[in-house]
UniProtKB/Swiss-Prot annotation:
GO MF annotation, one: ornithine carbamoyltransferase activity
Substrates-to-products reaction catalysed: carbamoyl phosphate + L-ornithine = L-citrulline + phosphate + H(+)
Gene3D superfamilies associated with the record: Aspartate/ornithine carbamoyltransferase
Annotated residues for binding of carbamoyl phosphate: 47-50, 98, 125-128, 262-263, 290
Alphabetized InterPro entries for the sequence: Asp/Orn_carbamoyltranf_P-bd, Asp/Orn_carbamoylTrfase, Asp/Orn_carbamoylTrfase_sf, Asp_carbamoyltransf_Asp/Orn-bd, Orn/put_carbamltrans, OTCase_ArgI
Protein name in UniProt: Ornithine carbamoyltransferase
Signal peptide, first to last residue: none
Pathway assignment: Amino-acid biosynthesis; L-arginine biosynthesis; L-arginine from L-ornithine and carbamoyl phosphate: step 1/3
Family: Belongs to the aspartate/ornithine carbamoyltransferase superfamily. OTCase family.
Primary location recorded for the protein, binned into one broad class: cytoplasm
């Protein structure tokens, strides 16, 4: 069983992953779920939180992790992804990959015979968003009809937030400049899931005030990701500032609204120091929760093994 996006999860699957995450957070050590199992951790781009949290997760579950960076593995260069996937499947029990192109993940999953986990791709960031959900849940907020407003670039995080929100019956607002909307395939999938469950909603807007009004959660991410080579910095500086999460925007939300950012943050750009360091900010709890969620994800993909 792979974890490439969230849209293959049923609501009960997502709830079980969050339930297991809470258990692992309360009981961090002493597990042997991954005893005698080897987990490949592939990184095509630099990583701090993802690498540390997955490496620790594997080891704290009793497994062995093997980290390979871009210059240490022939991923479509000198060797086809097909052959790499087939060979790695002979050695390891799970492949965790942070890749530049989502197609790389799909090929690893198609040609390999072991579960593949998306640690980040250009289209989707499921493990991050599961950690976001855990952060929301542990702060006592009910997902059903919760209003989550995302501000900035319609990127991989916003894509995954739409899917997660649809599955759990949330009201998701994605506020982006025009031409920076989230991926159309993910929008379509989210709307299909909303129709399936008959709960929740998805609103795309270029008005951050509308999105922030009475919001339970305000969320942002960097305006320019590491993989964004086509964005003009001056254009971003001109178009994006009104989507910054600052005290003025936060004042439109509910008084007990929480603020999330998946980090790393460009302080003073997408979010101010005042907000990210405030009591309403849960970004460092959110970062820690990557560890606990990823343990639950590893357990989930191996449940039929």
């Amino acid at each position: 069983m792979d974890m490439l996006t969230l849209w293959n999860l049923e609501r009960e699957d997502m709830e079980k992953i969050l339930e297991d995450s809470i258990y692992f957070k309360k009981n961090r050590y002493g597990h042997d779920i991954l005893k005698n199992k080897n987990i490949a951790l592939i990184f095509e781009s630099p990583s701090t939180r993802t690498r540390m949290s997955f490496d620790l997760a594997v080891n704290e579950l009793g497994g062995h992790s093997m980290v390979m960076n871009e210059n240490e593995i022939h991923l479509g260069k000198k060797e086809s992804i097909k052959d790499t996937a087939k060979v790695m499947s002979r050695f390891v029990d799970v492949i965790v990959a942070r890749v530049k192109s989502h197609k790389t993940l799909e090929d690893l999953a198609f040609y390999g015979t072991v579960p593949v986990i998306n640690a980040l791709s250009d289209l989707s960031h499921p493990c991050q968003v599961l950690a976001d959900l855990l952060t929301i849940k542990e702060n006592g907020k009910d997902f059903k009809n919760l209003k989550l407003a995302y501000f900035g670039d319609g990127n991989n995080v916003s894509n995954s937030l739409m899917i997660a929100g649809a599955i759990l019956g949330m009201n998701i607002f994605i506020a982006t400049p025009r031409s920076y909307e989230p991926n159309g395939i993910f929008v379509k999938k989210a709307l299909e899931i909303i129709a399936k469950y008959g709960e929740g909603s998805l609103t795309l807007t270029d008005d951050p005030i509308e999105a922030s009004k009475n919001a339970d959660v305000l969320y942002t991410d960097v305006w320019i990701s590491m993989s964004d080579k086509n964005k003009d910095l001056e254009d971003v500086k001109r178009i994006f500032p009104k989507f910054q999460i600052n005290s003025k925007l936060l004042s439109n939300a509910k008084k007990d609204a929480m603020v999330l950012h998946c980090l790393p943050a460009n302080r003073g750009m997408e979010i101010t120091d005042e907000v990210i360091d405030s009591k309403q900010s849960k970004v460092f709890d959110q970062a820690e929760n990557r560890l606990h969620v990823q343990k639950a994800v590893l357990k989930y993909v191996l449940k039929d093994k």
